[in-house]
């Protein structure tokens, strides 16, 4: 009876746990888990389909095939629960135990576990101090290993070949023992004394001075201490028993025609059992040694393949030549257990369909087809039908729904009303890719989507599909409504700007209604009230675009009829000024932003919907369409193109006269055509921008044009200046697939049509665009995945970490132009110190205050240009960041809440545009857009010129030539404040005098954009040194012109030579340089051209050589994505630059073969030497003063150098600026703090340099806060703490070195991560997000933060 009651008990809840430990299994443990031994390779009987006894599917071991029914049929049904059948030995129980019961195979000979053998560095090898090759020789029966020895010449673990063994046996009979195969290795492992070994190794490490030796010992020590501390025994890496997976996890399914489909694992197990049984038989028969060895080796190989197919030897394939999936393959990769089933599951109560536009919907609604809703909400409908008493059982409810009775639809309406559903569009690149809406039932089969949320989803209606999910629990519904509702996601989490912005037709309509037209009905009328104006419009007395005056509360306003109508739509708190202008897309975005900040969410949502309706209405009324005559080709085009052709002929002539090189010719031609293309575009835009109207007095006036194409582009509805240029200007230069620009431009535009050659050239660009898109989408997705993985554990853990540290925020300048104003960089951040007005001394912002829009405006007004702000980079919170260091939650507009997953948001914000960037190339159709090289400095404001650190010589024509690198020109205002600051390149010509007053738009300096000059600082006679034709120099004769030029080349014979040009006096002595100790000797790097003849007499400031700059490639995002990935992965760039590690004066030391020696001498202390390859161009000069961190040569700076020279903050600033640069080129705005979060995660660990009394090892990498905790503990105890230096890890490395082994294993290199974790007996505390998702718990972020047990 009791049995029966047990059956009706509630099912047990899920197991509660808060940690997961992984370790090695001992043979006893495996047998303890097992429910019996699998002795035979048989699976099921092909006639009866019953499992064979003792086989791989044996019911006795794994449990019955049918619920409560033994194999022979003696016991059936519930009443015999728990009985073990005496005939067939099967326990009568539910068949689902076949999913959880393990079996085992007892091996006749031990085998090595391949993970611990082959996963580098080999764990078995580390314990025994043997190489992988040596181990394999023993394991695969080639060599003997000494397992016991009393002879000094034969220490334990010595390898002996067959003849060496015989020889040793005759020399030392009965004094040693050898073994072979896994048995020998097991014996050696069991004999290791881990505690003694680790002590010896630590002593060795302390005493050795060689870096490589220390690293080697450190690796070995790590493994040994892992075994010592985890309680795992090294001999467990050799298997004596193999567990067998439960049969329902490796099913065997009968197909029609008497065949079977089976899991590969069954084949693999079968091979192991066959070989094991054969080995047992051979051992019983006392077979010859050689046969037994062969069989043991085959057993070892079959177990290797079962665990990890293809790790050693060739991949074992099945009948259809497909590699068999081993146990490791089940875990690995995108299709493995982690990523396929644990991190990404399919969910019930979901559907997908095509989307169409729903212009009548409100912002919080979406249309769901009735048929779909009926299926999604079935259980709710059954419940409602029962409650209403329309049906009595679930079965009858189901029938009623299937019949489609009238009541069912009414019930469906009730269920769906105000029920939030979640819509998702793949690819979900950021959190706005999943939003909640209230469902509205519609006829038809397509989901209807509100047009304004398309931008967030990146959706359009050309056949996109979306998925619908139903949140079931009350909590899920609340979260969907409060957090995910589209009305609560007005701002983008990436940059805090609205994502719900009108686009396309809506913009066109609103733009059209707010434009003014000259001389239309009702112009000049004055209305006493808004109502009167609108009545006048309704009676068609006044035109929509008529200029009128109207009386409003703030006074009489000049406006137009359309703007009055629009003004009625905005909330009361938004002043009329905000809409009393032409509403382009930018203006509408600003209006929505203003409304959100001043009127709140609700009003913004209402406004957005009203704008949508009005926009559509007036776009329809406007009836804008385009025709071919709207594309006006400028009359001046022919002349401009002709002029371009003449200039190109001129350049060709210079080239054939040998005045310029092929590279210079190419660059000049490209520049000419870029310029012509621009000029034609400007002429064309001028032509369509304005048209002539007749005003009411009959005079002709110019006004903004109503040309349809111009209207579309100007409003921001569709099309760009570039596209119009191609339609009506000239198509311009195109790029080859390699990225190089083709010299011949396309002179025609699309209205005129392309000829065959032009068409052929354009196919290049177009095709490259499409190919790139496909490739780069994948790369961008991979970048996002790496970023999410590194940042997933960064959440907001506390309100304030009380740190006193922060970073400096400054506006971002480029050549005197403000690219990013200070306001953009500090908005929503928390001030670290009081911000004081430099003139009045008034405190504008108090320390610890969040800087909102109003404060930022005050700071910008006061002209403040640097503020100390809190930053996640300096946050002291452990395992996360604090709210004060993070600042504003950009997607919500207030200080961030605790528990917010800022890491994931940061990763999405950086990764999402990555894919957009990749898709950018494609719209302009591959026309080459390359900025004409900036070769001059122009002022943006007037003022007084001041030089800073500018050394120059005057050349023969009296122009100042800049002779040093960090020269700057300032423009100061009347108060003497610096208004603009420009860096001036070495070799530039300065065209103004110090102290001169200048107007705006004055050219201060210019230089050659294509070459870097080498300038003589003194006059005299030129002499060559080490310039030998055919060795260090080559005369290159141009095939076209027959002219020769001298180019310095790299050659094996000239390694020790240093090609140079010296300036000497008439007595043949090299002249000294004025104001420095050096001489007028100029080294020529490889690739430079010599510009002066030997023996020529020159004046100071003459160019003696030139180094050509790279021929320009088109600026495609290819520079972008790979560059971003390179920075985040901290890869060594292709041509790294050497940087100065100290401040000091530069001099050149004695040359080393092939390298030049740059010496930096500080005022006090040691001088430092740097060796630079001769082929590289050194950009510092004798006597220059350099600062630490400045590059000494051309090339890309290596992030790790910045970290070691200038520290963490400088590195972070470098990374943020470099990454932002790539995105800014593409016009993508990302807030700095997102990049800072990722950089913080990359800098999470420190590298132990001295261990002293701490528990760490030299060379170990640990979290900074663990190191600090240990340091504080040791100092408190009066002991000596270790020392550490900050460590910068690339995002992949950082993800793999995370605390959580579950998270790391699900990212990459699964087997390696699990092997290391098992060996160390790692415990996963389940603190991050990913590991909790995998374990099926609530994540420790957001609403789950207080719920985690």
From Swiss-Prot:
UniProt-annotated binding residues for Zn(2+) 1: 70, 72, 85, 88
Pfam families according to UniProt: RNA_pol_Rpb1_1, RNA_pol_Rpb1_2, RNA_pol_Rpb1_3, RNA_pol_Rpb1_4, RNA_pol_Rpb1_5
Listed GO biological process terms: DNA-templated transcription
Cofactor requirements of the protein: Mg(2+); Zn(2+)
SMART domains reported for this sequence: RPOLA_N
EC class name: transferase
Cofactor comment text: Binds 1 Mg(2+) ion per subunit. Binds 2 Zn(2+) ions per subunit.
Binding-site positions, Zn(2+) 2: 801, 875, 882, 885
GO terms of molecular function: DNA binding; DNA-directed RNA polymerase activity; magnesium ion binding; zinc ion binding
E.C. number(s) listed in UniProt: 2.7.7.6
InterPro entries the record matches: DNA-dir_RpoC_beta_prime (IPR045867), DNA-dir_RpoC_beta_prime_bact (IPR012754), RNA_pol_asu (IPR000722), RNA_pol_N (IPR006592), RNA_pol_Rpb1_1 (IPR007080), RNA_pol_Rpb1_3 (IPR007066), RNA_pol_Rpb1_3_sf (IPR042102), RNA_pol_Rpb1_4 (IPR007083)
Keywords per UniProt: DNA-directed RNA polymerase, Magnesium, Metal-binding, Nucleotidyltransferase, Transcription, Transferase, Zinc
Role description: DNA-dependent RNA polymerase catalyzes the transcription of DNA into RNA using the four ribonucleoside triphosphates as substrates.
Protein family according to the UniProt entry: Belongs to the RNA polymerase beta' chain family.
Quaternary assembly: The RNAP catalytic core consists of 2 alpha, 1 beta, 1 beta' and 1 omega subunit. When a sigma factor is associated with the core the holoenzyme is formed, which can initiate transcription.
NCBIfam families: rpoC_TIGR
Protein name: DNA-directed RNA polymerase subunit beta'
Origin organism lineage: Bacteria, Pseudomonadati, Thermodesulfobacteriota, Desulfobulbia, Desulfobulbales
């Amino acid at each position: 009876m009791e049995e029966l009651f047990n059956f009706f008990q509630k099912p047990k809840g899920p197991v509660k746990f808060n940690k997961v430990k992984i370790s090695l299994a001992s043979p006893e443990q495996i047998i303890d888990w097992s429910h019996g031994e699998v002795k035979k390779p048989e699976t099921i009987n092909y006639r009866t389909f019953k499992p064979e006894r003792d086989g791989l599917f044996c019911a006795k071991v794994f449990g019955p095939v049918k619920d409560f029914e033994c194999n022979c049929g003696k016991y059936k049904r519930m009443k015999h629960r728990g009985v073990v059948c005496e005939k067939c030995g099967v326990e009568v129980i539910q068949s689902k135990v076949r999913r959880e019961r393990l079996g085992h195979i007892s091996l006749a000979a031990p085998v090595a576990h391949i993970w611990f053998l082959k996963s580098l560095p080999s764990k078995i090898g580390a314990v025994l101090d043997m190489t992988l090759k040596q181990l394999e020789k023993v394991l695969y029966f080639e060599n003997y290993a000494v397992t016991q020895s009393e002879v000094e010449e034969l220490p334990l673990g010595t390898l002996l070949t067959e003849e060496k063994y015989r020889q040793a046996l005759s020399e030392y009979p009965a004094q040693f023992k050898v073994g072979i195969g896994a048995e020998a290795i097991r014996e050696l492992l069991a004999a290791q004394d881990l505690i003694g070994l680790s002590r010896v190794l630590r002593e060795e490490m302390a005493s050795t001075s060689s870096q490589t030796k220390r690293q080697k010992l450190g690796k070995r020590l790590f493994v040994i201490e892992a075994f010592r501390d985890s309680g795992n025994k090294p001999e467990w890496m050799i298997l004596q028993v193999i567990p067998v997976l439960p049969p329902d996890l490796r099913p065997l399914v009968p197909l029609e025609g008497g065949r079977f489909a089976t899991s590969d694992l069954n084949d693999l197990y079968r091979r192991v059992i066959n070989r094991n049984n054969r080995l047992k038989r051979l051992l019983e028969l006392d077979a010859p040694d050689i046969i037994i060895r062969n069989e043991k080796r085959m057993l070892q190989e079959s177990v290797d393949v079962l665990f990890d197919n293809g790790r050693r030897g060739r991949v074992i394939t099945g009948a259809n030549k497909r590699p068999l999936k081993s146990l490791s393959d089940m875990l690995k990769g995108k299709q493995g257990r982690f990523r396929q089933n644990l991190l990404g599951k399919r969910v019930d109560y979901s559907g997908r369909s095509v989307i169409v536009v729903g212009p009548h919907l409100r912002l919080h609604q979406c249309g769901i087809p009735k048929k779909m809703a009926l299926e999604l909400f079935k259980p709710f409908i059954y419940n409602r039908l029962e409650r209403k008493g329309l049906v009595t059982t679930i079965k009858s409810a189901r029938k009623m729904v299937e019949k489609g009775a009238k009541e069912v639809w009414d019930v469906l309406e009730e269920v769906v009303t105000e029920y939030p559903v979640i819509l998702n569009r793949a690819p979900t690149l950021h959190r706005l890719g999943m939003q909640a809406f209230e469902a509205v039932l519609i006829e038809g089969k397509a989901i209807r989507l509100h047009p304004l949320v398309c931008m967030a989803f990146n959706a359009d209606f050309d056949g996109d599909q979306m998925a619908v999910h139903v949140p079931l629990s009350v909590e899920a519904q609340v979260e969907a409504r409060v957090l995910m509702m589209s009305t609560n996601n007005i701002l983008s989490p990436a940059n805090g700007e609205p994502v719900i912005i009108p686009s396309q037709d809506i913009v066109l309509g609103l733009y059209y209604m707010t434009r003014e037209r000259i001389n239309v009905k009702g112009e000049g009328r004055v209305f006493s009230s808004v109502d009167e104006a609108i009545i006048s419009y309704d009676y068609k007395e006044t035109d929509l675009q008529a200029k009128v005056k109207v009386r409003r509360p703030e006074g009489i306003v000049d406006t137009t009829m359309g703007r009055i109508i629009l003004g009625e739509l905005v909330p009361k708190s938004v002043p009329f000024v905000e809409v009393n202008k032409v509403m382009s897309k930018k203006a509408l975005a600003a209006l929505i932003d203003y409304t959100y900040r001043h009127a709140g969410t609700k009003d913004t949502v209402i406004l957005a919907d009203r704008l949508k309706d009005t926009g559509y209405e007036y776009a329809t009324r406007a009836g804008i369409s385009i025709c071919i005559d709207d594309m006006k080709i400028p009359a001046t085009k022919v002349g401009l193109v002709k002029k371009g052709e003449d200039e190109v002929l001129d350049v060709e002539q210079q080239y054939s006269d040998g005045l310029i090189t092929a590279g210079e010719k190419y660059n000049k031609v490209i520049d000419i055509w870029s310029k012509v293309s621009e000029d034609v575009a400007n002429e064309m835009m001028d032509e369509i921008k304005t048209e002539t109207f007749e005003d009411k007095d009959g005079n002709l006036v110019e006004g903004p044009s109503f040309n349809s194409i111009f209207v579309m582009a100007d409003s921001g509805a569709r099309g760009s200046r570039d596209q119009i240029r191609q339609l009506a200007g000239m198509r311009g230069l195109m790029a080859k697939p390699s990225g190089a620009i083709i010299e011949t431009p396309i002179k025609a535009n699309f209205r005129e049509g392309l000829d065959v050659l032009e068409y052929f050239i354009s196919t290049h660009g177009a095709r490259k665009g499409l190919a790139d898109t496909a490739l780069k989408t994948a790369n961008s997705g991979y970048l996002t995945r790496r970023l999410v993985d590194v940042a997933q554990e960064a959440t907001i853990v506390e309100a304030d970490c009380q740190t006193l540290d922060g970073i400096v925020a400054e506006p971002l300048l480029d050549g005197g132009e403000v690219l990013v104003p200070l306001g953009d960089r500090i908005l929503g951040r928390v001030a670290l110190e009081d911000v004081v007005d430099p003139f009045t001394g008034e405190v504008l912002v108090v320390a610890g205050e969040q800087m909102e829009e109003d404060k930022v405006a005050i700071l910008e007004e006061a002209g403040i240009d640097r503020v100390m702000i809190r930053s996640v980079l300096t946050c002291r919170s452990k395992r996360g960041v604090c709210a004060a260091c993070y600042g504003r939650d950009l997607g919500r507009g207030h200080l961030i809440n605790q528990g917010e997953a800022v890491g994931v948001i940061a990763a999405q914000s950086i990764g999402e545009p990555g894919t957009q960037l990749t898709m950018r190339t494609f719209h302009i159709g591959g026309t080459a857009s390359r900025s004409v090289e900036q070769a001059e400095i122009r002022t943006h404001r007037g003022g007084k010129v001041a030089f800073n650190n500018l050394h120059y010589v005057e050349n023969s024509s009296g122009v100042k030539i800049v002779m040093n690198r960090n020269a700057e020109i300032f423009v100061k205002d009347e108060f003497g404040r610096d208004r603009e600051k420009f860096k001036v390149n070495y070799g530039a010509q300065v065209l103004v005098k110090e102290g001169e007053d200048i107007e705006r738009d004055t050219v201060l300096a210019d230089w050659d954009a294509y070459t870097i000059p080498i300038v003589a600082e003194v006059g005299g006679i030129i002499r060559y040194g080490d310039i030998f034709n055919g060795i260090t120099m080559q005369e290159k004769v141009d095939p076209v012109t027959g002219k020769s030029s001298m180019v310095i080349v790299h050659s094996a014979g000239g390694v020790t030579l240093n090609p140079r040009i010296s300036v000497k006096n008439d007595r043949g002595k090299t002249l000294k340089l004025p104001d420095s100790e050096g001489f007028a000797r100029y080294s020529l790097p490889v690739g430079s051209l010599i510009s002066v003849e030997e023996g020529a007499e020159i004046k100071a400031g003459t160019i003696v050589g030139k180094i050509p700059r790279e021929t320009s490639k088109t600026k495609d995002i290819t520079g972008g994505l790979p560059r971003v990935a390179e920075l985040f992965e901290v890869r060594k760039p292709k041509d790294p630059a050497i940087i100065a590690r100290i401040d000091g004066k530069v001099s050149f030391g004695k040359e080393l073969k092939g390298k030049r020696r740059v010496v930096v001498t500080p005022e006090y202390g040691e001088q430092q030497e740097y060796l630079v390859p001769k082929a590289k161009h050194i950009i510092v000069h004798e006597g220059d003063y350099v600062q630490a961190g400045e590059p000494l040569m051309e090339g890309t700076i290596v992030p790790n150098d910045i970290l070691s020279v200038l520290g963490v903050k400088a590195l972070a600033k470098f990374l943020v600026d470099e990454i932002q640069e790539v995105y800014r080129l593409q016009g993508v705005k990302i807030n700095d703090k997102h990049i800072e979060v990722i950089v913080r995660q990359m800098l999470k660990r420190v590298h132990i340099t001295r261990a002293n009394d701490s528990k760490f090892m030299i060379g170990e990498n640990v979290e900074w806060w663990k190191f600090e905790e240990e340091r504080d503990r040791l100092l408190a105890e009066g002991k000596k703490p270790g020392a550490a230096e900050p460590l910068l890890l690339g995002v992949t490395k950082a993800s793999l070195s995370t605390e959580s082994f579950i998270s790391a294993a699900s990212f990459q290199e699964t087997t390696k991560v699990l092997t290391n974790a098992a060996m160390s007996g790692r415990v996963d505390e389940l603190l991050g997000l990913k590991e909790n998702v995998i374990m099926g718990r609530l994540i420790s972020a957001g609403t789950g933060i207080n719920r985690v047990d």
